[in-house]
C-alpha cells in the first residue's frame, strides 16, 4: 500500500467515488495541488485551492515572498500540461500571496494552457490567508465551491 499515490489509495476506499476525486489544498497544500494538476490523474475530476503558493513571509515579514518570479514561472510550467479544472480562491488581505502575486500566478497558469477559475474574496480577519480555517468564512467561499462543483456533475 505504501507505494501507491494517496489519490489511488483513497480512490480504493469504499466511501470514495473512485473516478470522481476532488483534491483540495490550502497554502503549501494548495501549491502541491497545483503541481498535481500537471499530472492529470484519471481519477481526479477537479482541484480546489485556497491561498495556494510557497515562499511567503520570508524572515517573518508579511508580503515578502522569497522568489515570486520563480513561483510565477513554476506555476506556468504546471499549466503547460494541466488539463484538470481548478478553482483558485484567495483574499484581498492574504499576506502570503496577495492579489498582485496570485493574479500573476493565475495568468501564468492559464496562459500556458491550464484551466483555473480565479477569485479574490474581500479581506477576511487580520490575514485572509487563513480563510479556510474559520467557520465564519464558509458563507464566503462555499457558494464558489458549490457552483464550481455543480458545473462538473
Predicted feature locations:
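C-terminal catalytic histidine-bearing segment of alpha/beta-hydrolase fold enzymes
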Residues: 112-153
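Generic recognition of short, well-ordered alpha-helical segments
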Residues: 35, 100-104, 136
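Alpha/beta-hydrolase active-site loop
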Residues: 1-14
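Alpha/beta-hydrolase fold nucleophile elbow
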Residues: 15-27
Amino acid at each position: 500500500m505504501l507505494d501507491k499515490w494517496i489519490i489511488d489509495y483513497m480512490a480504493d476506499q469504499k466511501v470514495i467515488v473512485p473516478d470522481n476525486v476532488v483534491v483540495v489544498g490550502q497554502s503549501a497544500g494548495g501549491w502541491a495541488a497545483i503541481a498535481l494538476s500537471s499530472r492529470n490523474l484519471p481519477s481526479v475530476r477537479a482541484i480546489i485551492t485556497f491561498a495556494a503558493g510557497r515562499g511567503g513571509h520570508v524572515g517573518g515579514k508579511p508580503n515578502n515572498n522569497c522568489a515570486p518570479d520563480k513561483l510565477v514561472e513554476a506555476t506556468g510550467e504546471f499549466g503547460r500540461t494541466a488539463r484538470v479544472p481548478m478553482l483558485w480562491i484567495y483574499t484581498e488581505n492574504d499576506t502570503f500571496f496577495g492579489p498582485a502575486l496570485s493574479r500573476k500566478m493565475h495568468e501564468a497558469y492559464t496562459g500556458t494552457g491550464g484551466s483555473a477559475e480565479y477569485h479574490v474574496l474581500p479581506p477576511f480577519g487580520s490575514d485572509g490567508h487563513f480563510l479556510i480555517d474559520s467557520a465564519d468564512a464558509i458563507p464566503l467561499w462555499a457558494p464558489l465551491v458549490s457552483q464550481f462543483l455543480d458545473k462538473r456533475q
